[in-house]
């Protein structure tokens, strides 16, 4: 083993570098991750700042924001995903060539953020497409986005070509594009995320090593495991939940109680 190492060091002194095909392939992909020009809300402002001279995204080979999904490797979901915008996000993702990656930037893209109890906000983009790296924050700083990019590069370095689906002659996988129906998001005519209700679909897990994930539509009559809410939440109907969210019930929002002085109001 030491003899092989000595031979490699001697060859490097002569300008000859020895490596494996897999490492060389991964090095090329990790060094030229081109993001899609795609922003949704305030997190997109921080994404724009990351591409400026102060943070110098070009050091990582990711400064080439492409205007077409056909030329992009990375989708940065930067901001709140509304249920009307969700079909467009999935459609853009399907148009990206494989291998393709997703960074969920900010609390809104990851779980709905402060708007998660809103009737029109998707509670995490991983309900519809797989996510490789999550960035917490509201909004995250450019340094956090750089750290996410470096994390993604490490994941790319660790990929094995014989395990990933997209290497070879296997067909690319397209994810179902939801339609905004009468009561919310629908896939193949089945309600998966009702307006004002709870998601009826489980999230995808990270595709770091190329395995396929869940994303199964769970039948409304069966017991569901909600990706955000706890399992004690019950539905009165497919469009309405019983009670309130656990965060509100346990006062996790830490909102101070508002006391009203009626006597003072009467004096006025």
Swiss-Prot record:
Documented EC number(s): 7.1.1.-
Single Gene Ontology BP annotation: aerobic respiration
Record's catalysed reaction(s): a quinone + NADH + 5 H(+)(in) = a quinol + NAD(+) + 4 H(+)(out)
Sequence positions that bind [4Fe-4S] cluster: 42-43, 108, 138
Region annotation (Disordered) ranges: 237-268
Basic and acidic residues bias locations: 247-268
Entry keyword Protein transport: no
Domain of life: Bacteria
Cofactor note: Binds 1 [4Fe-4S] cluster.
Membrane topology: Peripheral membrane protein
InterPro entries, alphabetized: NADH_UbQ_OxRdtase-like_20kDa (IPR006137), NADH_UQ_OxRdtase_20Kd_su (IPR006138)
Alphabetized GO MF terms: 4 iron, 4 sulfur cluster binding; iron ion binding; NADH dehydrogenase (ubiquinone) activity; NADH:ubiquinone reductase (non-electrogenic) activity; quinone binding
Cofactor needs: [4Fe-4S] cluster
A GO cellular-component term linked to this record: respiratory chain complex I
Record localization: Cell membrane
Alphabetical keyword list: 4Fe-4S, Cell membrane, Iron, Iron-sulfur, Membrane, Metal-binding, NAD, Quinone, Translocase, Transport, Ubiquinone
Family annotation (NCBIfam families): nuoB_fam, PRK06411.1, PRK14819.1
PANTHER family per the UniProt record, alphabetical: NADH DEHYDROGENASE, NADH-QUINONE OXIDOREDUCTASE SUBUNIT B 2
Function: NDH-1 shuttles electrons from NADH, via FMN and iron-sulfur (Fe-S) centers, to quinones in the respiratory chain. The immediate electron acceptor for the enzyme in this species is believed to be ubiquinone. Couples the redox reaction to proton translocation (for every two electrons transferred, four hydrogen ions are translocated across the cytoplasmic membrane), and thus conserves the redox energy in a proton gradient.
HAMAP family: NDH1_NuoB
Subunit structure, as described in the record: NDH-1 is composed of 14 different subunits. Subunits NuoB, C, D, E, F, and G constitute the peripheral sector of the complex.
The protein's name: NADH-quinone oxidoreductase subunit B 2
Species assigned in the record: Roseiflexus castenholzii (strain DSM 13941 / HLO8)
